[in-house]
Amino acid sequence: MADFLKGLPVYNESNFSRFHADSVCKASNRRPSVYLPTREYPSDQIIVTEKTNILLRYLHQQWDKKNAAKKRDQDQLEIGETSAPPRKIARTDSQEMNEDT
């Protein structure tokens, strides 16, 4: 091992005193974890990714949820105004006040 380290800029044998080549091989003997699918998908299925950023998509969805109720209310007001004018109802309390005086 000393011959291998001779050309390196910093040479100190104690840096590699605990190194054992056998220990590296033992760690790699473990089987890697493998994904096993639970469903069968068609082989001709095409997976398409979204072009927009995930964060931007999430923020747009949240904004749409937040403003959906406001937009719906505004649309109903616009429809109500154009379809029929609001009815005027005579106030009954003003007549009672005039009778008291």
Swiss-Prot record:
Q: Which UniProt keywords apply?
A: Ubl conjugation pathway
Matches recorded under InterPro entries: DDA1-like, DDA1_dom
Pfam families the record matches: DDA1 (PF10172)
One GO biological process term is: protein polyubiquitination
Pathway, per UniProt?
Protein modification; protein ubiquitination
In the UniProt record, does the keyword Magnesium occur? Answer: no
Q: Name one GO cellular component term.
A: Cul4-RING E3 ubiquitin ligase complex
Positions of the region Disordered?
67-101
Q: Which domain of life is it from?
A: Eukaryota
Give the quaternary structure.
Component of numerous DCX (DDB1-CUL4-X-box) E3 ubiquitin-protein ligase complexes which consist of a core of DDB1, cullin-4 (CUL4A or CUL4B), DDA1 and RBX1.
Q: Please report which protein family the annotation says this sequence is part of.
A: Belongs to the DDA1 family.
Q: What biological function has been recorded for the protein in this entry?
A: Functions as a component of numerous distinct DCX (DDB1-CUL4-X-box) E3 ubiquitin-protein ligase complexes which mediate the ubiquitination and subsequent proteasomal degradation of target proteins. In the DCX complexes, acts as a scaffolding subunit required to stabilize the complex.
UniProt-recorded name of the protein:
DET1- and DDB1-associated protein 1
Q: What is the organism field in this record?
A: Xenopus laevis
